[in-house]
Amino acid sequence: MANRLVLSGTVCRAPLRKVSPSGIPHCQFVLEHRSVQEEAGFHRQAWCQMPVIISGHENQAVTHSITVGTQITVQGFISCHKAKNGLSKMVLHAEQIELIDSGD
């Protein structure tokens, strides 16, 4: 079954870094996406805020460059996480993060 998502946007919530009891580092943040997409021949505004998590030692170096306002492209897969309040939320599990050059 295919489960791939590529999403570009701006980090809108400060990264939270944690280490699991088994020693695996995790970095969590929220990515805000805004764009204009074409659907059925019409242009429409597309907007979402997507929680992102990236795990593992090999992926943590790029996360130290990420702050609120950083523009990035994230590639990975989506999965549901159950929150403490019992509600499920969709989360993008990043496998690759690329910083977008703002041109400054």
UniProtKB/Swiss-Prot annotation:
Which Gene Ontology MF annotations are present?
Answer: single-stranded DNA binding
Q: Does the keyword Cell membrane apply?
A: no
Q: Which GO terms describe its cellular component?
A: primosome complex
Sequence ranges assigned to domain SSB in this UniProt record: 1-101
Q: Note the PROSITE patterns from the entry.
A: SSB (PS50935)
The reply to whether DNA-binding figures as a keyword in the UniProt entry is: yes
Query: Which keywords accompany this UniProt record?
Result: DNA replication, DNA-binding, Primosome
Q: Which GO terms describe its biological process?
A: DNA replication, synthesis of primer
* Record-stated family: Belongs to the PriB family.
What this chain does, per the entry, is described as: Involved in the restart of stalled replication forks, which reloads the replicative helicase on sites other than the origin of replication; the PriA-PriB pathway is the major replication restart pathway. During primosome assembly it facilitates complex formation between PriA and DnaT on DNA; stabilizes PriA on DNA. Stimulates the DNA unwinding activity of PriA helicase.
Q: What does the subunit comment say?
A: Homodimer. Interacts with PriA and DnaT. Component of the replication restart primosome. Primosome assembly occurs via a 'hand-off' mechanism. PriA binds to replication forks, subsequently PriB then DnaT bind; DnaT then displaces ssDNA to generate the helicase loading substrate.
Q: What is this protein called?
A: Replication restart protein PriB
Q: Which gene encodes it?
A: priB
